[in-house]
Curated annotation (Swiss-Prot):
It is a peripheral membrane protein. HAMAP family: PSII_Psb28 (MF_01370). This is Photosystem II reaction center Psb28 protein. One of its GO terms (biological process) is photosynthesis. Its main location: membrane. Keywords: Membrane, Photosynthesis, Photosystem II, Thylakoid.
Length: 112
């Protein structure tokens, strides 16, 4: 079980686009998530976005770097960023992504 939440206890079913970057030394990196029309922004939702929680059997990875995108005053997307300050944090994130990706049909593709 690997899932993403924006409010504790409320799974986000929309699968995001994810872009990864890492320094040449591998010491630091980041993951940028883009959710187009996530359910947390739907008309029926009343839950507050408190961060982005990546949850699996190892625990959770949390970021508060979460922004909403609005078009003509209507919420359309969420962008979130996770920062990695060590190779161990990167490795932990990649283990989460392997689980999340296999459950949601995501594939890892290196850029050219």
């Amino acid at each position: 079980m690997a899932e993403i939440q924006f409010s504790k206890g409320l799974k986000e079913p929309v699968v995001p686009d994810i872009r990864l970057s890492r320094t040449k030394t591998g010491e630091k990196g980041s993951a940028e998530f883009y959710f187009k029309q996530p359910t947390i922004l739907g008309d029926q939702q009343t839950e507050e976005i408190t961060g982005m929680y990546l949850i699996d059997e190892e625990g959770e990875i949390v970021t508060t770097k979460v922004k909403g995108k609005f078009i003509n005053g209507k919420p359309m997307a969420i962008e979130a960023t996770v920062i990695f300050n060590s190779p161990a944090e990167w490795d932990r994130f990649m283990r989460f992504m392997e689980r999340y990706g296999s459950e949601n049909g995501l594939e890892f593709t290196k850029s050219s």
